[in-house]
UniProtKB/Swiss-Prot annotation:
Required cofactor(s): Mg(2+)
Protein name in UniProt: Polyribonucleotide nucleotidyltransferase
Residues holding Mg(2+): D531, D537
Organism (species): Mycobacterium ulcerans (strain Agy99)
GO cellular component term of the entry, any: cytosol
Catalytic reactions of this protein: RNA(n+1) + phosphate = RNA(n) + a ribonucleoside 5'-diphosphate
Described function: Involved in mRNA degradation. Catalyzes the phosphorolysis of single-stranded polyribonucleotides processively in the 3'- to 5'-direction.
The keyword Nucleotidyltransferase is assigned to this record: yes
Top-level class of the enzyme under EC nomenclature: transferase
UniProt gene name: pnp
Length: 762
């Protein structure tokens, strides 16, 4: 690491990441040149060609009436960063891409808990992508730049926060891998954290705050080739491998802040508003503890919530006169007391809100084929969490087209997650998906990507929709389970079934033999309340053999390695239990639905693609109209033919082969053709797709002279014709065949030849 003043008022700090045989990556942070009116601004560089600007601003006046911290993170992708003009109608950037939204969430998740509790000033972090090498990803650079600009803004922020992507490539964890290197990766994870102290050996002690991880879509192929499988122990090793890189990035950010003279501003500029006063909490605790403790033993969510609300109303009524005008504080204190009681019971008694033990899973249920005309459907239930999964199959050409700065241009597998307000028994807005829904859909999508068949094995575009019909803990992991079931019901040949589970963590100081020790309790299959009141939300999805996706968010200043390893092992036990229940509902792919298209793949020579398409699409459109099949042609000559019935698909294939791999007609062959064009000198008749012949005007009158072709035939008429001649250029001359001649020829072909006269007489 190094920091320097490159010119007056412009400071630059550098972190060099050494990946051994994979080379080095250089991350630079610069401040003092761009966006100087923002409270804090940093330009982040990855090597020489990747550049983005992060600017942090804060409102001058706090929003005292807010009961939440108003932090907003926005990522602005500029197409000029990749030397492109946007493909939209107005040729300018519009709504954020999915990549941008997911990056916003990656930044928000570690930054939000780093601010002091009770801050009510509006904080906005805007990251603008200015330059991007198409072989690199910008998301982890954005995490670091956003942290650095927030640190420089002088806000009450316990940063800096460092973010790094590490990928397991050829047995080594590589930091900041490029897109080309990721093609060889088994596992890929984004890890964010901050320095919270110093280890005994003098190295920085890094607390992990956020993890977003996934197995790559080539993991099974790579593991079969000898690469290590991303098991729970391997994933834990990856988290440890990320810590030195995070420490280097945090150190560079801190050096930049120190060199530029950034200081945290006083409380007068950014006042903190405690949710409640100590006197209010003491009063609420005195009158509510016993009744609330009893209410929290009720197993059902609805009944428990109802009783809790009744107690809250009683407390408000009893304390209203004493604390007039402080009703909000009473409500906040009541919530804090609820949190304390829930956590105490878990840590001391290992007893949870609904009566389960710490490793118990709620009642599980799985069934398939619920939606009659859907190509695949399933219902997965875990306690009060209920997910309907629906699968739709279509031609590969229906894959999503992506116009963003990311390396992905098309998406064949699309996972959409919907969370309607009725799933929690509430009213609310419905319509376009919010960031949370996009994030949950992306997590479920990543969990299933490693087990999907390739396009060669299964030539379909796949849309998976997860409908959260009931929510009480981890609908995203329920979506993974429902999706696996629905995909199998649709006939998708998954390489292995995938299940997911949400884990939680509660920690507290406990007196043991006169000494205070920190106790950690890991919870399997957390409820919504346990998620809100706990210290960690930890979602793990995978097959019976390895992890396919992982998401972790923690509020603690570090989780001991043995605690994290234990949580991963506990999650695997739960995952195996869920997979057994799912296998009882369906364990192999079903027959495809009669409503799903049957897609067949054929190859045609590349030089024949133009003939198959025809001028202005004339040939391919006519095949589609005649056979009612859908046809899609790739640049390499791969043709996808889809139809809901076999004969239609086969008819289309035959017509395509007749053009691309033609059996040339011969003189004397007869056809029932269609007149496709008339001219002054004759009529053109279609014999085969892309193969026409000419009946000269002199042959149309059956021996009589005619003045005009249209007096005899018109476009669309059917004519029985015979090939009279094929010239050296392949042009075909036709003559009309009389109906009786055609019938006689057919009869002669069907009847046995007459016996020789001499033989007959004998």
């Amino acid at each position: 690491m190094s920091v320097a003043e490159t010119e007056e008022g412009v400071f630059e700090a550098t972190a060099t990441i050494d990946n051994g045989s994979f080379g080095t990556r250089t991350i630079r942070f610069e401040t003092g040149r761009l966006a100087q009116q923002a409270a804090g601004s940093v330009v982040g560089y990855l090597d020489d060609e990747n550049m983005l600007l992060s600017a942090t601003t804060a409102s001058k006046n706090p929003k005292e009436h807010f009961n939440f911290f108003p932090l907003t993170v926005d990522v602005e992708e500029r197409m000029y960063a990749a030397g492109r003009i946007p493909g939209s109608f107005f040729r300018r950037e519009g709504r954020p891409s999915t990549d941008a939204i997911l990056t916003c969430r990656l930044i928000d998740r570690p930054l939000r808990p780093s601010f002091v509790n009770g801050l009510r000033n509006e904080i906005q972090v805007v990251v603008t992508i200015l330059s991007l090498d198409p072989n690199d990803l910008y998301d982890v650079v954005a995490i670091n730049a956003a942290s650095a600009s927030t640190q420089l803004a002088g806000l009450p922020f316990s940063g800096p926060v460092g973010g790094v992507r590490v990928a397991l490539i050829d047995g080594q964890w590589v930091a900041f891998p490029n897109v080309e290197q990721l093609e060889r990766a088994v596992f890929d994870m984004v890890v964010a954290g901050r320095i919270v102290g110093t280890e005994e050996d003098g190295t920085p002690d890094v607390a992990i705050m956020m993890v977003e991880a996934e197995a790559t879509d080539k993991v099974i192929e790579l593991v079969e080739g000898g690469a290590p499988a991303p098991t729970e122990s391997v994933v834990a090793q990856g988290l440890e491998a990320a810590k030195p890189f995070i420490a280097a990035l945090c150190t560079a950010q801190q050096e930049l802040a120190d060199a530029s003279g950034a200081t945290v501003k006083t409380g007068a500029e950014y006042p903190v508003f405690p949710e409640y006063g100590d006197d209010v909490y003491y009063a609420v605790s005195s009158v509510a503890t016993d009744g609330l403790a009893a209410a929290l033993t009720i197993g059902g969510k609805a009944e428990r919530n109802q009783r809790t609300e009744e107690i809250k109303a009683e407390v408000l009524e009893r304390l209203a006169d004493t604390y007039e005008g402080r009703e909000k504080e009473i409500g906040a204190a009541f919530r804090s007391l609820t949190k304390k009681l829930v956590r105490q019971r878990i840590v001391t008694d290992h007893f949870r809100i609904d009566g389960r033990g710490v490793t118990d899973i709620r009642a599980l249920s799985a069934e398939v084929a619920l939606v009659p005309r859907a190509h695949g459907s399933a219902l997965f239930e875990r306690g009060e969490t209920q997910i309907l999964g629906v699968t739709t199959l279509d031609m590969v050409k229906m894959a999503q087209q992506i116009d963003s700065l990311g390396p992905e241009t098309t998406k064949r597998y699309m996972h959409h997650y919907n969370f309607p307000p009725f799933s929690t028994g509430e009213t609310g807005r419905v319509g376009s998906p919010k960031r949370r829904e996009i994030g949950h859909g992306a997590l479920a999508e990543r969990a299933l990507m490693p087990v999907l068949p390739s396009v060669e094995e299964f030539p379909y575009a796949i849309r998976q929709v997860s409908e959260a019909l009931g929510s009480n803990g981890s609908t995203s992991m329920g979506s993974v389970c429902a999706s696996t079931l629905a995909l199998l019901n649709a006939g998708v040949p998954l390489k292995a079934p995938v299940a997911g589970i949400a884990m939680g963590l509660v920690s507290d100081d406990v007196e043991v033999d006169g000494k205070t020790e920190r106790r950690f309790v890991t919870l399997t299959d957390i409820l919504g309340a346990e998620d809100a009141f706990g210290d960690m939300d930890f979602k793990v999805a995978g097959t019976k053999d390895f992890v396919t996706a992982l998401q972790l968010d923690t509020k603690l200043d570090g989780i001991p390695s043995q605690v994290l390893a234990g949580a991963l092992a506990q999650a695997k036990d739960a995952r195996l239990t869920i997979l057994e229940v799912m296998a009882e509902a369906i364990d192999t792919p079903d027959e495809m639905s009669p409503y799903a298209p049957r897609v067949t793949t054929i190859k045609v020579p590349v030089d024949k693609i133009g003939e198959v398409i025809g001028p202005k699409g004339k040939v391919i459109n006519s095949i589609t109209e005649e056979t009612r099949a859908q046809i899609s042609i790739e640049d390499d000559g791969t043709v996808f033919v889809g139809a809901t019935d076999g004969p239609s698909a086969q008819a289309a294939i035959d017509k395509i082969n007749a053009i691309a791999n033609p059996q040339l007609p011969t003189v004397g062959e007869r056809f029932l053709g269609t007149v496709v064009k008339t001219t002054d000198f004759g009529a053109f008749v279609a014999l085969l797709p892309g193969r026409d012949g000419l009946v000269h005007i002199s042959k149309l009158g059956k021996g009589k002279r005619i003045a005009k072709v249209e007096d005899v035939v018109n476009v669309g008429d059917k004519l029985r014709v015979e090939i009279a001649d094929i010239d050296k250029r392949g042009k075909i001359s036709l003559v009309l065949v009389a109906e009786d001649d055609d019938s006689a020829a057919a009869a002669a072909a069907d009847s046995p030849a007459p016996a020789d006269a001499a033989t007959a007489s004998s």
